[in-house]
A protein has these predicted regions:
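N-terminal soluble domains immediately following signal/targeting peptides that reside
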Residues: 2-84
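Short, ordered beta-strand-loop transition motifs
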Residues: 22-26, 125-132, 140
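Short, hydrophobic/aromatic-rich segments at coil-to-beta transitions
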Residues: 40, 130-135
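Short Lys/Arg-enriched alpha/beta "domain-start" segment
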Residues: 87-118
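A short, structured surface patch at a secondary-structure boundary
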Residues: 134-138, 145-146, 150-153, 157, ...
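Sec/Tat-exported extracytoplasmic proteins
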Residues: 211, 219-222, 269, 277, ...
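Charged, glycine-enriched surface loops/patches
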Residues: 284-337
Length: 344
């Protein structure tokens, strides 16, 4: 293992202490035992910043070529994405997220099992892996005004307050296709995957529902009790149960999808935000309007990353036809952990 710093003095692993095997002016290397295809906990001691201190790391060690071979074996001539090999290389991650995958990606450390097919919907893909882990892909580009917005809206604010790791995570929201890893409460995922996918931990039981349609679908799926904040005011809410809860202050209005009240989200312990696609520019938007909308979207996702609240945009209304729109209930079933339930 090599650290990009010359200040590391030792590493603790498997109950033993290991000293540098090599050192340069900019790095320190150690030879340590690890278990393959499993998360390994190590502790490194560094004298950087004047004071000696230990830092705990989790590393996942694998043979990349084996993963690529597995992907090729089920590709049937199609391109297969391998998630977990790009690390912090955001340019490669962005390239892999320009379009939705036709074949389930190979995810380092996870075993692919099945796909929930979308017969009509065009803007999402759902792939299932072991441990009950699911990969959800959502197309954030097709039939939007994103192209008109240009590229300058992607430039992160210098006052965003995000550290380098958070900046990497926030950048995932700027991809044309966003990949989410839906992870059950007790499941363990390989270290480093959060650099390439947005991790949504279940249970998502303090949900912000950004629209009446989201509220309605959650009620049909029997998940209304998970809604704690909403994006519609009481006088515009069409759900009587939520209106009553708002009157009792059990459910709080936390701003619209395009203008969130972050303090209220934090106060109500929001752990998942389901936004309407109104946060994206419409296809015929002017350059100015599209840029303004995408800039606001970027700033919003930066803040939500800082607050550790995953954001999922519901593009059901952008689908063509009622059958395609209805199929988005499959997305809700996955993210809310109610796969066996169907909307009436």
């Amino acid at each position: 293992i090599t650290f990009s710093s010359p200040h590391y003095q030792y590493v603790k692993a498997n109950g033993n202490v290991y000293y540098p095997s090599a050192k340069t002016g900019s790095s320190t290397s150690f030879v340590i035992p690890v278990e393959m295809n499993k998360n390994n906990s190590v502790v490194g001691m560094t004298t950087a910043m004047s004071t000696a201190h230990e830092i705990k790391y989790t590393i996942f060690v694998y043979i990349a070529e084996a993963a690529k071979a597995n992907a090729s074996a089920r590709a049937n001539g199609k391109e297969v994405t391998v998630i977990g090999v790009n690390g912090s290389d955001s340019s490669k991650t962005a390239t892999a997220n320009k379009k939705m995958d036709e074949v389930a990606p190979e995810i380092i450390g996870l075993e692919y099992q099945s796909e929930t097919k979308a017969e009509y919907a065009k803007y999402f893909k759902i792939y299932h892996y072991d441990q009950g882990i699911t990969l959800l892909e959502i197309d954030m580009n097709k039939k939007t005004g994103r192209k008109a917005a240009g590229k300058k809206w992607k430039e992160a604010s210098e006052i965003s307050g995000l550290n380098p790791a958070e900046q990497e995570q926030a950048a995932l929201y700027l991809n044309k296709v966003i990949k989410y890893l839906i992870v059950p409460e007790n499941a363990e995922i390989p270290a480093g995957l959060d650099k390439e996918v947005i991790v949504v931990r279940q249970p998502a039981d303090h949900v912000y529902a950004g629209s009446n349609k989201t509220i309605s679908l959650m009620e049909e799926l029997g998940q209304l009790d998970k809604v704690t904040t909403v994006g519609v005011k009481k006088n515009k809410c069409k759900n009587e149960t939520i209106k009553e809860k708002m009157a009792e202050k059990e459910v709080i209005y936390a701003g619209t999808s395009g203008k969130l009240n972050y303090k209220k989200l934090v106060k109500n312990k929001c752990n998942l935000a389901l936004l309407s696609s109104s946060v994206l520019p419409e296809k015929r938007s002017s350059k100015k309007a599209a840029k303004k909308k995408m800039t606001a979207y970027r700033k919003m996702t930066e803040k939500m990353t800082l607050l550790q609240i995953p954001v999922i945009v519901d593009r059901a209304k952008d689908e063509k036809g009622k059958d395609a729109q209805k199929e988005w209930e499959k997305v809700y079933q996955v993210i809310l952990g109610c796969d066996g339930q169907s909307a009436e």
